[in-house]
UniProtKB/Swiss-Prot annotation:
Subunit structure: [Alpha(6)beta(6)] hexamers of two multifunctional subunits (alpha and beta).
Protein name: Fatty acid synthase beta subunit pkiC
Reactions mediated catalytically: acetyl-CoA + n malonyl-CoA + 2n NADPH + 4n H(+) = a long-chain-acyl-CoA + n CoA + n CO2 + 2n NADP(+); holo-[ACP] + acetyl-CoA = acetyl-[ACP] + CoA; holo-[ACP] + malonyl-CoA = malonyl-[ACP] + CoA; a (3R)-hydroxyacyl-[ACP] = a (2E)-enoyl-[ACP] + H2O
Family: Belongs to the fungal fatty acid synthetase subunit beta family.
Function description: Fatty acid synthase beta subunit; part of the pki gene cluster that mediates the biosynthesis of 2,4-dihydroxy-3-methyl-6-(2-oxoundecyl)benzaldehyde. The first step in the pathway is the generation of the decanoyl starter unit by the FAS composed of subunits pkiB and pkiC, which is then transferred directly from the FAS to the SAT domain of the non-reducing polyketide synthase pkiA. PkiA condenses the decanoyyl starter unit with 4 malonyl-CoA units and performs one methylation step to yield 2,4-dihydroxy-3-methyl-6-(2-oxoundecyl)benzaldehyde.
GN (gene name): pkiC
Region (Acetyltransferase (AT) domain): 174-425
Single biological process term from Gene Ontology: long-chain fatty acid biosynthetic process
Residues of the MaoC-like domain: 1518-1617
């Protein structure tokens, strides 16, 4: 970039001069500033600005300007002069420039960009919408302001605070608490600090060390791991920020959120130039949401900066302790892994569930419903009432998951409920878990609160110290009136008391509420206080989407912005007023739009179709709508409009009401209105009913029809929003929103009247051009008054919500000028109506004389329940609700009754009627009868035709008849339409004469079609009869059904009960007189409202102005920070020199080379300097040198007097290790013995006898398994998980891994024996195996003991292996074995021979023949107990133990002993003993069993292991091994001392393998067992690598197979970063509670079991004895021969005479028969005698296959359905032979088959059928089915019974005869 030549003020300075200038001291600069200034130009890339620099400083600033522009030309990307100027300020901050120079530049910047019109926040907010950039620019500005040290200018108080000081505004400060902010609080604090570091430096300097020291203290450090709460580092370096889950936890988020709130308050004070005392004086009150209450207390007690920081430090410490205590007091529960969200950013299950969409009463009822199934300690509580329909429920996570599941069931999400009555709808519930780690505001935290209160008992803040009111979040009371300690009150309010937020914020009527929170607090407050005249100020934001909210721009502006002004409440802003004059008038905003009082008459068909009635209302001074729904063509409507125009004053315009749901009509009606408007007809308004058009269509109406206002009648919340959207797009055009809800007369929605308005009133009132009118249910002044004043909503707990006008409809139907027939008026007057709470009863039937039916447009419509309307309602249910196809069928079946009802009850009778007055079809009528029927129905005697179009219709039919019949053409000329119009009787007489055949000829089908087509001709008034029961029946019945209410004379028999009368169910209460003029009705309502307003007001109220004032600030202020309270960070760290350390004989670990001195002993120098040392005769790496070098916190001290070297290693969390080194000769002598003695003291507290024999038994102390022990165990391994509290099941069974803790004493005792040898410093734990004895578990409360034996001592490549097996006993009965394998690394050879004991797996040997028996008996190790007893047919189980002693020559001395058992009839029998002793190289006994036997526990390995649920879990090892050492009593220093671990040659303190195993086992419990740890039978963990504290691992589980009914799992733990394996494990798990169900007859199918038969090689082949039946399964058609042996099978039958005789089961089978053929028409598989054995055989074989693969659970239950009970019995008891069972089934089936008669093909007359009542209908229950079956059986005299009750209400099976129709062919009635 080429710099333009700068004017003459530019001077060239070289770089050396610039550097000299930059480094010049303030004293060398001019002492005073010249008043004259020079405009310094800045120009870069087309952007330029000027700064007016005092001449005194120009020479100092100009070089920096040049250097800046030179550097910026290659780097910057400037978009505006302001951005360029701020970049220059940033550039100057990096230069060493005098504060005076910076001050001059700052004043020039402010003058150029701020002037007197703005302040920096608004300026930067307009500069960029990007938050990061805004933070950067604000940070630059305020750091520059700090560097300039400009204290000469006073900071002007912002306009809001100026108004507060003069009491024009009443300010309330509100602080936020836990919620979504829990995850974002650190990020928000970092952003705040980035923008306002100079203002927050001291605050962070106070809070930061406080939190850090607390988090690293002994009391709390275990939770924070390696992440102590370092606030300064977290907010200044994003690399130090912990993960969001950790941040959101209460021990972190609670204090950080509190600090953030107070930081925002601190910034506000600084920017406005106020100290906390001055700021507090401008606040009327304060409170806080949940923990925000404590921040409010800080504000109330702070009168200066010092007091503010002091109170802040105390409250932040309190919040820290409260967060920690509450977090650890949270109730534990078992939450399945599947319930946790896998989606990033989604909140998983937590302790608090936010829900919205229910009222408080409904919410409490829902909580009670869930709590009813929960124990007392798992219950849920209503924790927060955030708004009238917004709550937070808190409690155990598992309980909240139940609540969430229930909410999903009852919510209406994704369900369209628009056509369901409001009170019958499911609620639409939105719910989500909050990122909160404890259930605040519940009794669960009562004890936690008590502990915190105790900690602060000595540091109280009495409530009398509160200088301003602070309102309690539960009671809403001023804390000062409560007395006592404010901190204690707040602690209880946060921890254990529910929060009633509306109560808290409503305690004081503030004009402005300042919210020091960025989350949802401001919108929540606005929602709670909306309409109350409260302006919400978002102190933490520069922007807002809500036009009524204020932001930081408003808060700091020196001139009042439009969004800062004081708001009026809805009650004040929209209340009605009284205008003085000759007559006091009621006025609302609507008056100016309509030019009439705010009580108007709605468009309604047929009442306001008549222009004379509309004119009467308008001439009375009121507004009324002309209903377009009663006009069927443009000419008629045009005539009516002109008639109306001519009948009203010239200055009045008319409003037309059109039905949007009728597209055909509205299209020509809109065109008509457009044409008339263009012709200067004064059409002022348009009302659209029955639907809201799109924005495009509505805009077209507004812009092209010449309207002055437009009205819409939305029917739902969504439609209301559409109306508001239309108004928003046309802000200068009046939009009237007419709301009637579902209670209005005529067409209505399914909505409640009040709820939609309550939900949308706020958005309606945001648009000043929307006028809200209430309709439906009004009839007198008392009903109108609450809605005009808004008191209706106050009674419901909401702010006053006035309407601008009232809409009357039904009430006007009885007005004197209305065309309503007298008979109809009398019906209306007699209709009682209902209250508002009862109108929804009209959906199910008449209520108050009114009923809801479905109109021709498919919409609900209110009508008086006359006979005709009741018929309508009946047909809606029975006919019109059916599909088209089903409807025609129903009409055909019920034709006669429907016609009868039409003729008796409805205004539109059945058209077909012959000369005798009989109801007939059209095809049964003559041509003349049709004409006579038309005139009889369409012409009213002594009056006229009902409609002119009816004359044309009748003439068209007559002409058609003449075309079809022979007639006298000359005489026909007299059949004119004029004659028909005037004298229809004369017309018919002439027609009969002219066409004599018309009287006798029946209608031709083509003429019938022509007639029906004419009945539906568009543009003609719909016919007033029903011509046919066809597809158009609904059209004929419902179309044009309202006019009869005004012309009862035209109705058959002049019967008003036939007609449809529109009327509202509530408004019916007011129509008691039928002769009041319209003006009188309206005046009485209006005057009554005026009278009540005069009674309630002391002076006449004036109507609020329609226009809203919008002002623009004239100037903006310049901000200067004069009273800032910032301080530089200081460090008190003292550094000691190395020489001082050396003189004091103390050495740091900064480096070995600098530590030793020549004066120190040689052994010490060698110890600390040499790379290697001699251990005995072996050269080893020097562990001491490594220790010193690798431990930065190690201190070495040398005591010259005692010649001792002291080494102290400081670990994190204040754990120290200490070592004393003394030089002695012969240090290796008895070294291992001394180490064993040391470990003996560590493990057992005393020096144990090491000479005990390896073959002895070691006994441990008695231990009681207490809940405290379990809690300590959970707390110890808990830190490994993200939240272990959700992994704690409700069970008294202890984790299997606690076995090692119980047995550690006896497991570790053999390790110190002299015979084992080995260096305990090099001891490694290789594996642990835990295995329960069958059906035993360790439980809380058990008193147990332990004993152990050494099972093996032998050498392998790594060293000497020692295996110790312990038994845990309860009441001297073994419960669990714990086997631990240890390795003494590098140690080999002992004073005793190596040996190994083992309990072998059980083996099964089946002796199937004498040959097998002889082989077994030939083994000399097999010794039968009874040699005379044969073993053939026995299945023996070998239970063996082996002892191996290893010899140096490679041979081994083997001793195998055990027993061979057999099970007979459920009893164990000892058949032989096994005893083998010999020296050998293998195990002959096991070799034999492996060749000829099989494992007793069947096992299956899956080809593809896996797990259907979540199979992995990330863990992080606990930060310290000390807790597990204390718990397990394994104080091996290699786990706790860095000195020892270094001496042992490992990189650090190793985690206990037992701990790693326990952590992995808990993962298995959680992921695989769902917390049901009682199912865990065996667990083995093998340690494959070292694990260090805080290492991140991934634990994975897989289901690998089955063994003897148990599930086999593999467990793998590996490092997360490298995938290196650190633990491998296996587990055996009992299956979940299992039931095996066996089906009965009817479940058979062709080919069943064939796949199994082909693939099975085991148990299934044993069932080949049932091959006869498998053949029947393979084919269902071939006959099958059976031989002689079944001759003797008979069954007893009863003859008709009662005699009992024996009958052969197989008739025709004789002693001489050579064969017998079974037959069945569907195949033998469907013959009972073959189906039953085939089913049982299949079930037995399938179950045997399951058992052979190890799938069958031992604890299962068995059940069978009918025949299946035999299958269940066979599976349960192995003593029942399969062959016998099959044979029994065949006999049973044969007897059953022979018990009923059959035909020649074997078929019977009996059958079974499954029934599902739900498929019939909801009315069809089990009782109905039982009644139906009984009646059919009684009428048919045949067998029919319900024989199976399978699923209640869904599946029943009936049995009985088939093909027996009921006599008479009629179905029995189900009624009664």
């Amino acid at each position: 970039m080429a710099l333009e030549e700068v004017p003459s003020v530019s001077r060239d300075l070289d770089h050396s001069a610039l550097r000299a200038l930059s480094s010049a001291s303030p004293s060398s600069l001019p002492s005073s500033c010249s008043r004259s200034t020079t405009s310094l130009l800045f120009q870069s890339k087309g952007i330029e600005f000027r700064l007016s620099i005092p001449d005194t400083f120009l020479s100092l600033v100009e070089p920096h300007r040049n250097a800046f522009l030179a550097s910026y030309s290659t780097q910057g990307n400037t978009q505006s002069p302001l951005e360029l100027a701020l970049s220059f300020l940033y550039f100057l901050l990096d230069q060493k420039v005098s504060p005076l120079v910076l001050s001059s530049v700052l004043r020039a910047f402010n003058l150029e960009f701020l002037g007197n019109r703005s302040e920096i926040h608004s300026l930067i907010a307009d500069l960029t919408p990007i938050p990061k950039q805004r933070q950067r620019w604000l940070g630059i500005y305020y750091r520059f302001l700090e560097a300039s040290d400009d204290k000469r200018a006073e900071i002007p108080l912002s306009s809001i605070f100026q108004h507060a000081r003069t009491n024009e505004f009443q300010l309330m400060a509100v602080f936020g608490g836990q919620g979504e902010c829990s995850r974002t609080c650190l990020n928000e604090f970092a952003e705040l600090y980035s923008s306002y570091e100079p203002m927050l430096r001291r605050l962070v300097g106070v809070i930061g060390p406080c939190l850090y020291n607390l988090s690293t203290s002994d009391e709390y450090s275990s939770y924070y791991r390696n992440q102590p709460l370092d606030l300064k580092a977290w907010i200044t370096d994003e690399n130090h920020v912990p993960d969001l889950g950790f941040v959101a936890s209460a021990p972190v988020s609670v204090p950080v959120i509190g600090a953030l709130s107070l930081a925002r308050y601190c910034v506000t004070c600084h920017i406005t130039g106020c100290n906390p005392g001055l700021m507090r004086s401008m606040l009327r009150t304060a409170t806080g949401h949940s923990q925000g209450l404590l921040a409010a207390i800080v504000v109330a007690v702070s009168h200066s900066w010092d007091s503010f920081y002091q109170a802040t430090e105390e409250v932040i410490e309190l919040l820290f302790r409260l967060g920690w205590e509450c977090h650890h007091a949270a109730p534990c529960s078992m939450v399945p892994a599947a319930n946790y969200a896998d989606v990033d950013g989604a909140n998983g299950p937590s302790y608090m569930l936010s829900l919205r969409g229910l009222k408080r009463q409904e919410t409490e009822a829902t909580i009670d419903h869930v709590n009813a199934s929960l124990p007392e300690d798992k219950r849920l509580y209503l924790a927060l009432i955030n708004a009238y329909d917004q709550f937070v429920v808190a409690g155990p996570v598992a309980s909240l998951l139940r609540l969430e599941s229930h909410l999903v069931e009852i919510t209406s999400k994704d369900i369209d409920q628009s056509r369901i009555p409001f009170r019958d709808r499911k609620p639409y519930i939105q719910h989500s878990f909050l990122p909160v780690s404890t259930p605040f505001h519940t009794p669960y935290l009562t004890r936690a609160a008590a502990r915190v209160k105790k900690q602060f008992a000595a540091r109280p803040i009495p409530t009398r110290r509160l200088a301003i009111p602070v309102y309690h979040t539960h009671t809403g009371l001023d804390l000062r009136k409560q007395g006592g300690c404010a901190l204690s009150i707040a602690i209880d309010a946060i921890a254990s008391e529910p929060c009633n937020w509306p109560c808290a914020v409503a305690s004081y009527h503030a004009s402005h509420i300042l919210t020091f929170d960025r989350g949802g607090l401001a919108p929540l407050i606005k929602r709670v206080r909306e309409g109350c005249g409260v302006r919400v100020v978002q102190v933490a934001d520069l922007d807002t989407r809500d036009s009524e909210m204020a932001t930081m721009r408003d808060l700091f502006a020196t001139k009042l912005l439009p969004t800062s002004t004081k708001l009026q409440s809805w009650g004040q802003q929209f209340r009605p007023g009284l205008a003085s004059g000759p007559k006091i008038q009621l006025e609302t905003r609507l008056n100016r739009v309509l030019g009439a009082p705010p009580i108007m008459v709605a468009g309604m068909t047929p009442t306001t179709v008549h222009p004379d009635f509309v004119a009467a209302i308008m001439n009375a001074g009121y507004h009324a709508e002309l209903a377009g729904g009663g006009y069927h063509n443009a000419s008629a409507m045009e005539a009516a409009i002109y008639d109306l125009v001519s009948s009203i004053p010239k200055e009045r315009g008319i409003t037309c009401n059109l039905i949007y749901a009728n597209p055909r009509s509205i299209s020509w009606q809109i065109e008509l209105l457009r044409r008339l408007s263009n012709g200067n007809v004064r059409i002022d308004g348009l009302t659209i009913g029955a639907g809201v058009p799109s924005l495009t269509v509505a805009s077209e109406y507004i812009e092209t029809l010449g309207l002055r206002h437009i009205s819409f009648k939305p029917g739902s919340v969504a439609a209301i929003r559409k109306v508001v959207e239309i108004a928003r797009e046309h802000p200068d055009f009046p939009v009237i929103l007419q709301w009637t809800g579902g209670r209005g007369g005529g067409h209505h929605s399914f909505e409640d009247f009040h709820a939609p308005i309550i939900a949308t009133y706020g958005i309606i009132r945001q648009e000043p051009n929307v006028y809200l009118v209430a309709g439906s249910g009004f009839g007198d002044s008392d009903s109108v008054y609450p809605y005009l004043t808004g008191s209706w909503s106050v009674a419901m707990g909401h702010p006053a919500m006035p309407f601008d006008g009232i809409l009357l409809g039904s009430r006007m139907m009885v007005a004197k000028e209305a065309h309503t027939s007298p008979a109809v008026r009398r019906i209306i007057a007699a209709t009682p109506g209902v209250s508002d709470s009862e109108w929804e009863k009209t959906y199910s039937g008449p209520a108050g004389g009114v009923i809801t039916v479905t109109s021709e447009m498919g919409e609900p419509i209110h009508k008086i329940a006359t006979r005709g309307v009741c018929l309508w309602a009946d047909l809606d249910k029975t006919v019109f609700s059916l599909s088209r196809r089903d409807r025609l069928t129903y009409l055909a079946q019920h034709r006669r009754s429907i016609i009868q009802r039409l003729n008796a009850d409805f205004a539109k009778p059945w058209f077909g009627c012959n000369s005798d007055g009989e109801a007939v079809d059209l095809e049964d009528m003559t041509y003349l009868e049709v004409l006579k029927r038309l005139t009889a129905l369409m012409f009213v005697p002594n009056k006229q035709w009902i409609d002119a179009s009816y004359i044309e219709f009748t003439m068209t039919i007559a002409q058609r008849w003449l075309q079809r019949l022979q007639f006298d053409s000359e005489a026909a000329a007299s059949l004119t339409i004029s004659l028909l119009r005037k004298a229809p009787d004369r017309f018919l007489a002439i027609f009969a004469d002219v066409c004599p055949t018309a009287e006798g000829d029946l209608l031709n089908p083509e003429d019938i079609s022509f007639f029906l087509m004419q009945c539906k001709t568009p543009g003609r008034k719909p016919v007033n009869f029903i011509p046919a029961l066809d597809d158009d029946f609904e059209f004929y019945f419902k179309k044009d059904s309202l006019w009869q209410a005004e012309d009862v004379d035209a109705v058959l028999d002049q019967d008003a009960e036939r007609v449809c009368i529109l009327h509202g169910p509530i408004a019916a209460r007011y129509s008691k007189s039928d002769s009041e003029p319209a003006g009188y009705i309206l005046d009485s309502i209006l005057n009554g409202v005026v009278a009540r307003l005069r009674e309630t007001s002391t002076a006449e109220m004036l109507l609020p102005k329609l226009e809203r004032g919008h002002t623009t600030p004239a100037s903006w202020s310049t901000l200067s920070l004069t009273e800032r309270d910032t301080s530089e960070e200081t460090s008190d760290t003292s550094i000691t020199s190395l020489s001082e350390l050396i003189e004091n004989h103390s050495f740091s670990s900064g480096g070995v080379d600098s530590v030793p001195r020549p004066s120190h002993p040689l052994w010490m120098r060698a110890l600390l300097e040499d790379d290697v040392v001699l251990q005995g005769t072996l050269r080893q790496k020097n562990p001491f040198r490594d220790l010193i070098q690798s431990s930065p916190n190690t201190v070495v001290n040398y005591n010259q007097d005692s010649s001792e070297l002291m080494v102290t290693a400081q670990e994190p969390y204040h754990i120290s290790s200490f070592m004393r080194a003394v030089c002695h000769d012969g240090v290796m002598d008895k070294r291992n013995e001394r180490i064993k003695s040391f470990y003996s003291l560590l493990w057992f507290g005393h020096d144990c006898d090491t000479s005990q024999s390896l073959n002895g038994v070691f006994y441990g102390p008695d231990i009681t398994l207490t809940e405290d022990l379990l809690d300590e165990y959970n707390a110890t391994i808990g830190p490994a998980y993200s939240d272990h509290r959700q992994m704690v099941p409700s069970t008294d069974v202890l984790p299997i891994s606690m076995g090692i803790i119980i047995a550690w004493d006896v497991i570790s005792r053999p390790l110190i024996l002299r015979q084992i040898g080995g260096d305990l410093l090099r001891l490694v734990h290789r594996s642990n195996t835990f295995e329960y004895y069958s059906d035993t578990r360790l439980r809380l409360g058990d008193s147990v003991s332990s004993r152990s034996e050494v099972q093996a001592v032998y050498d392998d490549d790594g060293g000497r292996v020692v295996i110790v097996e312990a038994q845990i006993l309860r009441s001297r009965v073994p419960v669990m074995t714990v086997t631990s394998t240890f390795l003494f690394r590098g140690s080999k050879g002992t004073t005793v021979p190596a040996f190994r004991r083992a309990r072998e797996q059980k083996w099964t040997y089946d002796v199937t023949s004498e040959f097998e028996e002889s082989i077994l008996l030939s083994r000399n190790w097999f010794r039968p107990c009874d040699p005379s007893l044969t073993l053939v047919g026995k299945s023996m189980i070998f239970d063996l133990n082996s002892l191996v002693k290893y010899h140096d020559d490679g041979n081994m001395e083997l001793h195998v002993q055990g027993t061979a058992m057999s099970q007979t009839n459920g009893q164990q029998q000892k058949l032989a003993i096994v005893d083998f002793r010999n020296t050998c190289t293998g195990n002959p006994v096991l070799d034999f069993l492996q060749r000829r036997g099989k494992l007793a526990e069947p096992r299956t390995e899956f080809k593809i292991p896996g797990w259907a649920g979540k199979s992995t879990m990330d863990i992080q090892m606990p930060p310290s091994n000390e807790p597990y050492a204390q718990l397990s009593k394994d104080f091996n220093p290699i786990h706790t001392s860095p000195i020892f671990s270094s001496l042992a040659g490992v990189p650090g303190t190793l985690c206990h393998g037992m701990c790693t195993s326990a952590i992995a086992e808990r993962v298995l419990e959680h992921l695989g067992l769902g917390g049901d740890r009682e199912r865990l039978r065996r667990f083995e963990a093998r340690f494959t690598d070292m694990v260090m504290p805080l290492e991140k691992l991934v634990v994975e589980i897989k289901h690998t197979g089955m063994v003897d009914g148990r599930m086999c799992f593999s467990i793998l733990a590996k490092r997360k970063e490298t995938d290196e394996r650190v633990l491998e494990g296996d587990a055996e798990v009992e299956q979940p509670r299992t039931a095996y169900l066996f089906t009965g007859q009817g479940s058979q199918s062709k080919g069943m079991g064939m796949d199994l038969y082909k693939t099975s090689t085991g148990q299934f082949l044993l069932t080949n004895k049932g091959g006869l039946f498998w053949t029947s399964c393979k084919t269902t058609q071939s006959p099958l021969p059976i031989r002689q042996k079944y001759l003797d099978i008979t069954t007893e039958v009863v003859l008709p005479n009662g005699k009992r005789v024996q009958k052969p089961v197989f008739p025709g089978l004789t002693p001489t028969s050579t064969s017998y053929t079974f037959r069945h028409p569907r195949g033998l598989l469907y013959s009972t005698q073959f189906a039953q054995p085939a089913i049982l055989l299949f079930e037995a074989a399938a179950f045997a296959e399951l058992r052979a693969k190890g799938y069958v659970s031992h604890g299962a239950v068995y059940a069978g359905h009918s025949l299946g009970e035999f299958g269940a019995l066979s599976a349960l008891s192995r003593s029942v032979p399969t062959g016998a069972l099959v044979e029994l089934a065949f006999y049973r089936g044969s007897v059953m088959q022979a018990s009923v008669a059959s035909d020649n093909d074997g078929g019977t007359t009996y059958g079974m059928v499954a029934m599902n009542p739900k498929r019939v209908g909801t009315f069809f229950t089990q009782t109905t089915l039982d009644r139906l079956v009984s009646q059919i059986a009684a009428q048919s005299q045949e067998l029919l019974e319900i024989v199976n009750f399978n699923i209640e209400g869904e599946q029943y099976v009936c049995s009985g005869t088939i093909d027996r129709p009921i006599s008479g062919g009629t179905w029995p009635s189900l009624s009664g």
